[in-house]
Amino acid sequence: MTMSSIMARIVAVIGGVALQWRKLQGAAPAPAWGGAPVVPAAKPQGALPTLKMPSARGWSEGQKPVAAPGLKVNAFATDLKHPRWIQVLPNGDVLIAESNQIAGKPRTVFHYAMQATMRRARALGESANRITLFRDRDGDGVAEVRETFMEGLNQPFGMALVGDTFYVGNTDGVVAFPYVAGANSITAQGRKLVSFKPSGHWTRSLLPSADGKKLYAGVGSLSNIAEGGMAVEEGRAAIYELDLTSGSSRIFAGGLRNAVGMAWEPNTGVLWTVVNERDGLGDETPPDYLTSVRDGGFYGWPYCYWGQTVDDRVPQDAAMVAKAITPDYALGGHTASLGLCWVPSGTLPGFPDGMAIGQHGSWNRSTLSGYKVVFVPFTNGRPSGPPRDILSGFLAPDERESYGRPVGVTLGSDGSLLVADDVGDVIWRVTGA
């Protein structure tokens, strides 16, 4: 047994005791959801935060997630390597970014345990660093054609096609490539548009503007609450706006700890995003959230959360706290809400206009949250009701194992909802029953 595994087991035992002690402190708080959530008071967990994460099992033959009433689900593509994000091309081809978080050098005993836990959950390991193309040639909802579209990338995540240029969000920046309609691959050399600092929250989501003149990129923080100081966080925890004509870039909005999925609300033209909030303050404190994004807006990280609730663990800046914007809609504590796409009314039978959200699932609370795909209804450009499940059943009944973990969500050319599952290594396809 290696020293790292010994250390991990020691911390796991201590963490298990701490987890049981926290459970004895009282009933679990109610989920913090919606436009006016009840966010429990912070209970800082110090050097040993709650650590609970199911082991990755994957799906058995014939097994699949549970679709909401009126819906059905099938596997569109299988046998991938940690599929994270989805891009659908105009001809219906489906591109899948296959990548993973890469382990850094552990700095503390807790980091040893955290890395061991994440490996067990398949959330840490080798990164395939490729984009794979799938094509459903006969229209039966299952891809028959599989091609390596791009390889040798650097933890690719976000993708976007604007005209004849294909953009990839590598962890260290956005790269542009020439694209030919219907091509099975891109082998040309790319052109880097902007560089980002890698590590930490490593995903780089992309979303073009409706007119194709701008490209938006999500760049998460390096750390949980800027433990290494704000200098190393410069240029992070933000959404960038790239001008595709001039090549210039700027921070469009900041204070967003880890903004991942982005989508346009088509009736208002407003940008929305889902954000993963900080750890170590309790099961529901603070909640992850869905929010509209204002040009020049600041959303609190690291100084405060859910508006202007100060995080006492962080050296404060009163001026920044004073201008922090309260998010629009809470998505529950530590649900790891990553995927986001607009779903027009009628796309899924019985579902009105709204947003589909892929919730990757928690690792740092006493009871698990997330591990599902949910839907938030919209009316007049804003969230208008409680969430509804689209897909569930990603966890074993005892919650010790996960069959899958949803990440990216998007609409296929046939109106189906496609869901990337990076534990099951599947792309799921949701349609009316």
Where are these predicted regions, by residue range?
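Beta-propeller domain segments
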Residues: 24-68, 105-107, 111-122, 126-128, ...
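Surface loop/turn motifs at the tips and blade-to-blade linkers of beta-strand repeat domains
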Residues: 77-80, 147-153, 193-198, 251-255, ...
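Hydrophobic core register within WD40 beta-propeller blades
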Residues: 86, 159, 206, 259-262, ...
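Residue-level detector of Asp-centered blade-edge/turn motifs that repeat once per structural unit
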Residues: 89-92, 161-163, 208-212, 265-268, ...
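Short loop/turn segments immediately following the C-termini of beta-strands
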Residues: 91, 99-101, 171-173, 179, ...
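Conserved beta-propeller blade signature
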Residues: 93-95, 165-168, 214-218, 270-274, ...
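Asp-box/WD-like beta-propeller blade repeats and closely related beta-sheet repeat scaffolds
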Residues: 142-165, 170-209, 221-224
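Blade-level signature of beta-propeller repeat domains, shared across WD40, Kelch, NHL, RCC1
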Residues: 410-433
